[in-house]
Amino acid sequence: MSIDLSLPELPILHPRITVVGVGGAGGNAVNNMIQSNLQGVNFVVANTDAQALEKSLCDKKIQLGINLTKGLGAGALPDVGKGAAEESIDEIMEHIKDSHMLFITAGMGGGTGTGAAPVIAKAAREARAAVKDRAPKEKKILTVGVVTKPFGFEGVRRMPIAELGLEELQKYVDTLIVIPNQNLFRIANEKTTFSDAFKLADNVLHIGIRGVTDLMVMPGLINLDFADIETVMSEMGKAMIGTGEAEGEDRAISAAEAAISNPLLDNVSMKGAQGILINITGGGDMTLFEVDAAANRVREEVDENANIIFGATFDQAMEGRVRVSVLATGIDGRNNKSETSPISQSEDSEKEKFKWPYSQSESTQDKTLETKPAEQVSEGAKWGSNIYDIPAYLRRKK
C-alpha cells in the first residue's frame, strides 16, 4: 500500500489594486495605462457618456446614472455627475469592494469627474473590504486620488468648479495628487502634440501605480509589503510623486534629482513631507554605493523626522540604467489622522447639500435669472432646461 503525500498548494497572495477612471479624462488615463501594458492592476472605467464608454479599451465599464442621464453625459454639471454616481453606487461597489488599494483618476472642472469621483471615494472609505488573505478582519480600502485641473484656456468658470471638486474629494481620499494641466506647458514644446501632452500627465498616475506595485512584487534585496505602503499613504492628505531615470556617470544622483523635481505637479514641495516612499530600481550592475547615493539625495530634501520607507528592486531590462521613484505624502503639513473618523467629522457638512456654482436650487435660480441679463446666464446654469435631450458631444460644442 503506497501513501501519497502531497503538500497543499499555497494560495496566491498579493494586494488587489484597482484603478477607476471617472469621466472622460479618467477614461483616457486608463486607456493610456492599458496601452502601456501596466500589469497587476484591475482597471475600471465609469462614465455618464455612453459613447465614451463604448470607445474605452477597458473591459470593465460602468454606465453611471442610466435613469438620470440616459447615457448622454452630465452636461458639465457636477451635481448631475454626483447624482449619477449615487444612482449606480451598488454597481461601483461590486467592482471595488475587494480592493486593498484604490486609485481614482479624473479631471476636475467638468460634470462627471468632478461630481462622481468624491462619491466613489466616499463609498470606498465607508466600505470595509474583507482582507481574506490575512487574519479574517475588516479593513478599509486605501484610496488615492490622482486628478487634473483645467487648462487656463478652458475659461474662468471651470477652475472654481475644479477647486470645489478637489475640496470635496480630499475629504474622502487618503492621499491626493493634483496635476494642473497648465503645467504641461513646462515640459511641452511647439512640436508636442495635444495627445502626447496628455499622455505625459497620465504618466504621473502610471508612475505612482508602478512605483507601488514594483516594491511589492518585483524581486529585490529590500522588498516592502502592503502594510509599509499603507503606513506612508493612509490619511496623509496632499502628495507629490516623481520618477527619474538615468544612465552613465552619476546615474543614481541624476535619477534621484529628476524624481524630486516633477514639473507637472501643483507647486508642491517635499520639504514638509511626513511620509516618503523611495523605490530604486536597476539591473544587476546596480551597486550599493549607487543605492546609498540616490536614497541620501532624496533624504536631503525632507525633514529628518519624516517617516521614510525604502525599497530596492531589480529589473534585468534596466541594465545600465537606474530609476528612482519617490512618493511624498503629507506635504500640506498636516496628518488627517485623529481619534475621530474622517467620515464622522464630515457628517455635519454632509447634512447640508453640497452646492456647486451654476447648479442652484430652483428658488435661487429664479432670483438669479431675474437679476441678470439673459445673455449672461450660462447654458449650464439653466438647471430646468432639457439638458439630457442634447447628446454630450453637442453640448460640448456650445
Curated annotation (Swiss-Prot):
Keywords in alphabetical order: Cell cycle, Cell division, Cytoplasm, GTP-binding, Nucleotide-binding, Septation
Binding sites annotated in the UniProt record for GTP: 24-28, 111-113, 154, 158, 202
GO annotation terms (biological process): division septum assembly; FtsZ-dependent cytokinesis; protein polymerization
GO molecular function (one): GTP binding
Stored InterPro entries: Cell_div_FtsZ (IPR000158), Cell_div_FtsZ_CS (IPR020805), FtsZ/CetZ (IPR045061), FtsZ_C (IPR024757), Tub_FtsZ_C (IPR008280), Tubulin/FtsZ-like_C (IPR037103), Tubulin/FtsZ_2-layer-sand-dom (IPR018316), Tubulin/FtsZ_GTPase_sf (IPR036525)
Span list, region Disordered: 333-381
Reported function: Essential cell division protein that forms a contractile ring structure (Z ring) at the future cell division site. The regulation of the ring assembly controls the timing and the location of cell division. One of the functions of the FtsZ ring is to recruit other cell division proteins to the septum to produce a new cell wall between the dividing cells. Binds GTP and shows GTPase activity.
PANTHER family for the chain: CELL DIVISION PROTEIN FTSZ-RELATED, MITOCHONDRIAL DIVISION PROTEIN FSZA
Family as reported in the entry's similarity comment: Belongs to the FtsZ family.
Protein's UniProt name: Cell division protein FtsZ
Organism: Wolbachia sp
Gene: ftsZ
